From Swiss-Prot:
Domain named Helicase C-terminal: residues: 1084-1246
Originating organism: Rattus norvegicus
Residue span of region Necessary for interaction with SS18L1/CREST: 1-282
Stated name of the protein: SWI/SNF-related matrix-associated actin-dependent regulator of chromatin subfamily A member 4
Positions of the record's site feature: Required for binding to 'Lys-15'-acetylated histone 3: F1505, N1506
Residue positions where N6-acetyllysine is found in the record: K188, K626
Chain intervals for the UniProt region annotation (Sufficient for interaction with DLX1): 837-916, 1247-1413
Ranges where the Helicase ATP-binding domain occurs: 766-931
Amino acid sequence: MSTPDPPLGGTPRPGPSPGPGPSPGAMLGPSPGPSPGSAHSMMGPSPGPPSAGHPMPTQGPGGYPQDNMHQMHKPMESMHEKGMPDDPRYNQMKGMGMRSGAHTGMGPPPSPMDQHSQGYPSPLGGSEHASSPVPASGPSSGPQMSSGPGGAPLDGSDPQALGQQNRGPTPFNQNQLHQLRAQIMAYKMLARGQPLPDHLQMAVQGKRPMPGMQQQMPTLPPPSVSATGPGPGPGPGPGPGPGPAPPNYSRPHGMGGPNMPPPGPSGVPPGMPGQPPGGPPKPWPEGPMANAAAPTSTPQKLIPPQPTGRPSPAPPAVPPAASPVMPPQTQSPGQPAQPAPLVPLHQKQSRITPIQKPRGLDPVEILQEREYRLQARIVHRIQELENLPGSLAGDLRTKATIELKALRLLNFQRQLRQEVVVCMRRDTALETALNAKAYKRSKRQSLREARITEKLEKQQKIEQERKRRQKHQEYLNSILQHAKDFREYHRSVTGKLQKLTKAVATYHANTEREQKKENERIEKERMRRLMAEDEEGYRKLIDQKKDKRLAYLLQQTDEYVANLTELVRQHKAAQVAKEKKKKKKKKKAENAEGQTPAIGPDGEPLDETSQMSDLPVKVIHVESGKILTGTDAPKAGQLEAWLEMNPGYEVAPRSDSEESGSEEEEEEEEEEQPQPAQPPTLPVEEKKKIPDPDSDDVSEVDARHIIENAKQDVDDEYGVSQALARGLQSYYAVAHAVTERVDKQSALMVNGVLKQYQIKGLEWLVSLYNNNLNGILADEMGLGKTIQTIALITYLMEHKRINGPFLIIVPLSTLSNWAYEFDKWAPSVVKVSYKGSPAARRAFVPQLRSGKFNVLLTTYEYIIKDKHILAKIRWKYMIVDEGHRMKNHHCKLTQVLNTHYVAPRRLLLTGTPLQNKLPELWALLNFLLPTIFKSCSTFEQWFNAPFAMTGEKVDLNEEETILIIRRLHKVLRPFLLRRLKKEVEAQLPEKVEYVIKCDMSALQRVLYRHMQAKGVLLTDGSEKDKKGKGGTKTLMNTIMQLRKICNHPYMFQHIEESFSEHLGFTGGIVQGLDLYRASGKFELLDRILPKLRATNHKVLLFCQMTSLMTIMEDYFAYRGFKYLRLDGTTKAEDRGMLLKTFNEPGSEYFIFLLSTRAGGLGLNLQSADTVIIFDSDWNPHQDLQAQDRAHRIGQQNEVRVLRLCTVNSVEEKILAAAKYKLNVDQKVIQAGMFDQKSSSHERRAFLQAILEHEEQDEEEDEVPDDETVNQMIARHEEEFDLFMRMDLDRRREEARNPKRKPRLMEEDELPSWIIKDDAEVERLTCEEEEEKMFGRGSRHRKEVDYSDSLTEKQWLKAIEEGTLEEIEEEVRQKKSSRKRKRDSEAGSSTPTTSTRSRDKDEESKKQKKRGRPPAEKLSPNPPNLTKKMKKIVDAVIKYKDSSGRQLSEVFIQLPSRKELPEYYELIRKPVDFKKIKERIRNHKYRSLNDLEKDVMLLCQNAQTFNLEGSLIYEDSIVLQSVFTSVRQKIEKEDDSEGEESEEEEEGEEEGSESESRSVKVKIKLGRKEKAQDRLKGGRRRPSRGSRAKPVVSDDDSDEEQEEDRSGSGSEED
C-alpha cells in the first residue's frame, strides 16, 4: 500500500512508518535520530535511558483476540467477588490475562478513568516524561512479563526462588520462576527509575545469549522501541514484526500525533502496513543506553495478533506454548499471578556493563552523517523544484509548489516543536516537584484494596464536605433568620408610621381637593360671568375672593373708562360748539343778504350745475301739513320755480336725524350754557328722540320705548337695568348717544341690494357721523367694506344733504377697483380718479377748484406729492382704505394728513386684524380722535403694565389677561366694528384649504443639498473659464436661495443656460417638457390645470417672485393655456381692464397670474373659485388677502385653496412660522408681549433652526398620489370620476410614447458638472474663497506727487497776476523734461541694459493686462458748478421735517451687502449720498441734470425696496421734492447773483480799495470768465482753486483713485 500524503507539506517518506501510528517525522522529513514525536527528539540524544514513566511493551507471544479477553475477564471478576482466588481456574485465567494484557494493541486505548486506575497518567494532567512512573496495580501497567517457551530459567541460587520452592509445590517450573523473578525485579527497578542490567534484560526475556547470536548482534541493529522513527533507507522500515522490543523505553499512550488514529490490535494504525517478516530491524540510537542494550538484545519471535480488518503477512512458526487458545504444554494449570511473595529490591543496584560487549559504531557520527545527507537532499530537492520548467501541467505544478513550500517550512516547524517541548518540560517539571509521590509507591496494593481505599476515601471526603456544608449552612441560616427578624421588626414599625402618614396625607389631600374644586367652581363661575359681561355678579365674586390684583384691575378699568367717557363728552361738546359757530355765521350772512336762494348744507347756493340740484327737497303744505318726499318732491335745482307754481308749500324743516338741532333748540342751548349741567341721562334721552316726520307729537311712553330699544341695540357693554341701577351711562352709550335707525339703502345706490349685516354697518357708520366721532370699519376681508363706504356716502348725500367733497385714499392697486364699484353701485355720484402723470393730474385742477364733484379717489403718493393742490379743499369726509398703513404715527402720510388736510370726519377701512403692538393701535386711534387719545405713553401704560406702579410682578395669568383684553375691547368698541364671515354671512360658500406636498426633481435635490449645507450654488464653471468642469458660486441670503430652488431651478439664469446647452436648446432658454420636469411644483400643476380647465374652474395663481411668473408664462405658452398677468409693474389704468376681462362670463382666460403683494389687495375676482398659492409668504395675512380675492361677497361656488409646499424643505418651516403668527394674531392682544421685541441672537437662532434639516414623520412627508390630489380639487363625485379617467388617459398616452421620460428629472439625466460629492464641492468652495481672499493679480499703481510745485510766495504772486495755471504748467513740463533727460542718459550709457529694461517693461505691461483697464480721463468741473452741486446736496441732506427729524439719515450711507443682502439682489444700481458726494468731488457729474438723475435714482431705489406707505418710502418722496425746489431756488439765486456781481465788479474797478479786496475781485473775475468760456465751449486750464488734487484714502475705491489720477493727467496735456 502507498504511503499517505505527508501532512503540513512535509517531504514524502522513503518507506512506511514502523510504529503504531503515523510518524511525526513525516512532518519534518526523514530523520536519522529518534522520532521527532518523542520528547527527546528535539533535544538530541538523551544522556540516560528514556523515562519509563509510561511503559508500553511491545508485542508479546500471547496475542489473544479482543473478544475472548473480554469474555475471560467477566468470570475472573465474578470469582474474585465470591472470594475464590485460590481456585486453579482463577490463576490460569489470570496468567493468560497477564500475558495478553502486556500488549497495548489488544483493544481500543484505555479511557482516562482506566488509565488512572491502572497507573497511566491522565491525558489532561499526566506527563510524557515523568522521572518516576505511577505505580500500577494490574499486570498491564508493568513491562512485558511473559516470555516465550525458550526463555532461560532463573538462577537456582536465588533465595527468593528457593523460598518459593520451600513453601510448597508451585505450578511454575524453574525457568519460569527465574523469569518471573527477573520480571518482578525489572519492574521494581523501572518503578524506581533505575537502569536494567543486561543480564537482567536477558533473564526477563527468558533467554540466554548464545555464541551464534552474539556474533550476529553487531550486524543486526536493535529492534525499534517506538513506532515513530522511519527507516533511513528506501526499504520498508521495521514494523511490529519478530524481534524483541527493548524494555528500556515505551512510547507513552496517545503520543502518536495530533491526528493519529487509535492503534489497531497489532499496534499499527489503520491504513499503515506492518513490516514484512524478515525485514531488517531498525537501530535505536538513544545514547549510551542504546549501545549497552544492542549486543544483549536478541530477536524474539512474536505471534502477531489477529487482524481486525485485513490480513497481515504470515508470522513465523509459533511454538505450541504460545498459542492464543491453548495454555503452554509445559505449564501446570495454575500459574503464579500473585506478586505478593516477591520482595521488592530497596537497595539501588549498581550499573553493570558486560565485558563481552562488542565494539559498535558511533551512533552520534551516524546521526550527524544522516542529518548531513538529509540536508543535502532537501537543498537539492528545493533547487529542483525551483528550476522546474514552466510547461508542467497544472496539477503537477500545484503539487510541486506545495512540496516546495513544505520544505521551506522545515526549520520553522522544528523551532515550533522545540518551543512546545520546552514549555511542556517546564510545566511537567513543576508538577513533579510539587507532587513528588505522584509516580511512585512503596507498597503494591491489589486492585480490590485500591478500590476499597478509594471508595472509603471518597465516602470520608463526602461526609466531611457534608458536615462542613451543614455547619456553614446552619451558620448562614442563623444570620439570615436574624436579618429577617430585624427587617420584620422595622417593617412593622415603618408600616405603622406609613399608615399614620398616609392617613394624615389623605385627610389633607381630601381637604385640598375639596377646596380646589370649590376654587375652580368659583373661578369658572367668575370666568363665565366675565365672558357673559355680567359685571355686577363678577364684582361680587371678586369681593368674595378678595383678590387684590383683580380688584385693582377692575378699579383701574373703571378709572380709565371714566376718563375716556369724559374725554368723549368733551370731544362731542367741542364739535357741537364748532357747529354752532358755523351756523351762526351762516345765519348772520343770510340776514345780511335778506333773501337767499336755496342753499346746500355746506352753505353754498344751489344751482343747476351742482350735483345737489338733482336731489329731491322735502316740502310741506302750510295749511294741511302734507309733506312731499322722494319722487313727488321737487328737485333742488327747480325748487324756486316749483314753489311759484304751487303756492301754499314751503321747504319742510329738517328733523333731528338730519340736523343736530333746530335754531330754537340752539338758542335754548345757548341760554342753558351758563346754568349748571343737567343729569347726564336727560339730555341724552332728548337727543335720542326721533320724531316721526308725519306727526310732531310723540307720547312719553313711545319715547321711553324708543330709548330702551336704542340702548339694547347699541349697548352691548352692560345691561340697561345695571346701568340705570348705578345711575351711570355706559361708555358706549355716551359715545353713541344720538342714534338713528337705517332700514334701507339710499336711493342713489342702484344695481344691487345691501345685505342685512351691511345695513347694520351703514347704521353704525351713520351713528358715528351723528355723534361727531370717527372710527374703524374692520370687517373681515371679502365682506364688502367698499360697498358699505359707498352706501355711507350716498346716504349722507341723500338724507344729510352732505354733498361732499369726500376724499378717499386707497392703494394704487385698488384704485381702479374702487372706480369700478362706484360706476356699478352709484353711477350718479361724480367721482374724480386723481392719478396719472403730472400733466394729467394738472388737468383735474379746474374741476377741483370749482367743486363740481362729490368723491375724489387718489393714492397715498399723490396725497403727499400734490398736497399744495389737494390740501386747499375743505373735505367733509376723509376715508383711508387699508388703514393699517397708518399704524406708524411718524410716517409721512400720517403727518401730511394731520398737518395739511382739513377733514373733521375720518374713517379707516382695514380687513387685517389689529396687530399686537400697542403703539400701532394708538397711532390709528390718535389719527381718528386726537383729542381723546392724546398720549401714546399713557395709552401703553394703561394696557401694557397694569401692575408696574404697584411693585408687584408684571406677569399676568389667564383671567387677568382676559380682563386686560376686555378693557381694550371696551375702549375700542365705540370706534371699531368688526364682523367675521362665519358670523354674518351664512350663505357664503365655504372655503377649503389644502396643503399639497410636492416632491423635488433630482436637479432640485442636488442644488438644494449643497445650498443648504455649504451655502453655494453649483455651476458649470463657465464664469471661471472652466466650462464643463464645474464650479461653485457662493450666494448670500441662503433662505431666499432655497426658496428659489424649491420653486424652480431655472430661476438661476446660469443654471437654465447651462441646461439648455446640455439639452440641446438654443438661446439659453429651456422649452417643452423639461420646463415642468425640472420642478416638482410645476409637475403638479401640469396634472392639475388640465382638469380644472376641463371642468370650467377659473384659477387664481399667486406667486412671490416675478421671475418665476416669467417661467410660468413659458410653461403656459407650451401648454396653450390662456392667462392674464398682474404684478407690481402693471400700470394702474391697465389693472381695471384686466379685472374686467377676467370676470366676463364668457372669458377665454381661465388663469389669472398674480403676485401676492401687488395682486392680493382689494381686487374683486369672485368669478374664480380655485386659488393656488404657489409659494407661501412670511406674512400669513398676505396669503389670506390673496385667498379673499375669490372668497368674497358674490361668490357662488365653493372655493378651494391649494397651497403648494415642497417636502422636506425650508417652505415647511415658513408655513409653520406663518401658522404660528396667525395663532398669535387671534388674540388681538397678548398682555406683556406688546413690544414684540426680539434680539438679533434670537433671530439668528430662528433662521438657523429653519436651515437645519430635521427628520419628519413619514406620514407628513408623504407626497400625495393622483387619487388624493383628485379628491382635493374635485367638488363632487362626477368631477372625481372625470379626473381619474383623465389621469388614466394621460398615463396610457405616456406609455405609448417610445421616447417617454419620467415625470421628474432623475440623476442620470444631469450633466457631470452638477453631480459632485461633498469633498469636490468643498474643494471648489475653497478655491472660490481663496480667489476672493487673494484676488486675481496685482495692479500697477501710478506714482503720485503730493508735494506743492510752488512756494507760498510764488503762489500768491501768481494769484495776483492771474498766471497761476501757466506757472504750474511750466513747472510740470520742467519735471517731465527732467525725467525724460534722465531716461535718455541712462539709455545712452548702457544700451544693452536699456534694451533689457525695455523688454522687462514690455513683459511687465503684458503681465499687468490682467488688472482693471485705465479709466477714462476726466477734466475737472468749473468751481461754480461744483459749488452748486455741493450746496444742493447739503441742503437736501440737512432738510428736517416739522418734528425736527432729519429725513436723509438713512440715505447717507447704505448698509453693507452682508447686513442687507436682499437690497443688493433687488436693486441693480445702489447709490447713497456718500457716493454722490464722492462723485461730485471726482467731477463725475458734468451738469446738474446728471446729479439729479442720481438723486432721483436714490429715491426710486428706496421706493422700490420699501413698502408703499412706509416711513422710508414717504421720506424718499419728500426728498425728491426738496431736491427739485432747492435746485430751482439755487438756479434763480445764481442768475440774480450774476447780474449783481457784474454791477459790483464795475463799481469795484472804478473805486480804490485795499490790496486784499483787489485780489478777491480778480479771483471772482477769473471765475466768471472761465464759466463763460466753458459755456461757449472753449477750453481753459483750470485755476489752482478749481483743480482737484488727487487724494488717496481707504474709503475711495481703486477705480475712483485711477480716475482722479487720470483727471490730473489730462491737465498735463
